[in-house]
Design a protein with these regions (language model features):
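Extended, low-complexity, turn-rich repeat/linker tracts enriched in Gly/Pro/Ser/Thr and Asp/Glu
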Residues: 6-8, 123-127, 131, 271, ...
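Extracellular glycan-recognition surfaces and repeat-rich motifs
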Residues: 221-266
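OB-fold nucleic-acid-binding modules
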Residues: 1-11, 15-212
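Extracellular beta-strand-rich recognition modules
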Residues: 50, 222, 280, 287-300, ...
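Beta-strand acidic-aromatic groove motif in beta-rich domains, primarily in extracellular
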Residues: 9-14, 58-62, 290-294, 303-312
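Extracellular beta-rich ligand/substrate-recognition surface
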Residues: 263-276, 336-343
Length: 387
């Protein structure tokens, strides 16, 4: 159990995750039962008898997969109070759930108990209650995290029925832990508290970096490349599976109209799988004290295709060594499927100070088949360092 309705911030639902620490998957259970914490408390190991149940999204297309008792119009319905005792069983074991450390909200973490550091509420919100008295159901409060030269903002969602709704947002910086979820209409990721004990803002507020103290050591806006051709030159353009590779295109998107961009997509490929890499030139992380990367991304024909931002410090710069190298995920913001195809999303400034040696940054696209053929686009890739 990663969530609890002890404080009333969850209603007739709970989330379970696949591990007490470093969880990678979670799922929602929808049941017609309030105060379920009396039997299914946070950290409780439970078993679910799946026969006769349904696994669908809460709202069609929202990505919040839920076990329920029935479906209607492609969406889940709750497991009734008469049925759930025959399907959900608790064990005698209750474990401590160690929150997964993250720096951005991502769909892959929905239902997982996560923690953010370097968080604070905007000064304008300090002293306000968690729930605005004018809100009937849920209140949204902005939380901000220092991310290089700007703030990464996301929403903390609180139910108007939560027992702590009248507690006020405090000043200071620190950590906040909660469950990654989505708004009622499924349009936006949010963080939801189990309890305000998981709000630990006991330190000073964070400080943004000064852009005047940094300079660019590598950048590429892709304007110098020939249009409609494969990307070559300093980038490594590698096809792991399928036939599609990264190419230069000129975008017509209103937010970036006329710019040349790096584009990948599996549409009309005819391949069951497409995996394509675009890997940066080497970055010497030992020549400077602090490095950040930044870029913008957009998409088209949003579906279940995927774009990952990765880093390696042991790749040998050969195509044959790409798969065997160690690649770690970086916490950059990549455009979501729900975003309009006209929009370009900033990655925020991604800190590379945890790495040393010679690093390579990779964009790895995975798609293919009839349901995973979406297009991703990258522009204005930049590596900066402190002077």
């Amino acid at each position: 159990m990663s969530s609890s309705d002890l404080t009333g911030n969850f209603y007739k639902e709970f989330f379970i995750q696949n591990s007490t620490e470093n969880a990678t998957d979670a799922i929602k259970i929808s049941l017609n039962q309030v105060d379920s914490y009396n039997r299914f408390n946070k950290g409780r190991e439970i078993y679910i008898y799946l026969k006769g149940l349904f696994l669908v999204e809460v709202k069609s297309g929202d990505g919040v997969y839920t076990i329920g008792g029935n479906t209607k119009d492609g969406e889940v319905e709750t497991l009734t109070s008469n049925r759930y005792p025959s399907h959900i069983f608790r064990s005698a074991s209750t474990e401590m759930i160690i929150p997964k450390s993250v720096s951005i909200l991502e769909s892959k973490d929905i239902g997982i108990f996560v923690t953010f550091d370097k968080l604070e509420f905007p000064i304008s919100s300090v002293g306000q209650p968690f729930v605005d008295p004018a809100d009937d159901y849920d209140s949204h409060k902005t939380v901000q995290r220092c991310s290089g030269f700007s703030y990464y903002n996301f929403i903390l969602e609180t139910s108007s029925f939560a027992s702590f709704k009248n507690e006020v947002l405090i000043d200071g910086g620190g950590s906040i832990s909660g469950i990654v979820s989505k708004t009622y209409n499924g349009s936006e990721l949010v963080l939801v508290l189990n309890t305000t004990e998981d709000v630990e803002l006991n330190s000073s507020r964070c400080t943004l970096s000064d852009s005047n103290e940094f300079s660019v050591i590598f950048e590429d806006d892709f304007e110098s490349y020939p249009n409609n051709l494969s990307i070559t030159g300093v980038w490594n353009n590698f096809i792991e599976a399928g036939s599609k590779e990264w190419k230069i295109k000129t975008t017509t998107d209103s937010q970036n109209q006329g710019s040349k961009i790096a584009q990948i997509g599996a549409y009309n490929s005819g391949d069951s799988s497409n995996v394509a890499w675009l890997i940066s030139p080497p970055i010497n992380l030992d020549s400077q004290s602090i490095e950040f990367i930044n870029f913008q991304s957009s998409n088209s024909f949003s579906d279940n295709s995927n774009l990952e931002l990765l880093i390696s410090t042991d790749w040998n710069a050969t195509n044959s060594g790409i798969i065997s190298a160690t690649w770690s995920a970086l916490p950059g913001i990549i455009v979501s499927d729900s975003e309009s195809y006209q929009n370009w999303i900033d990655s925020s400034y991604i800190d590379l100070s945890a790495y040393s040696g010679t690093a390579f940054i990779a964009f790895k696209y995975t798609g293919g088949g009839t349901n995973n053929s979406g297009t991703f686009e990258i522009d204005n890739f930049q590596v900066i360092t402190q002077n």
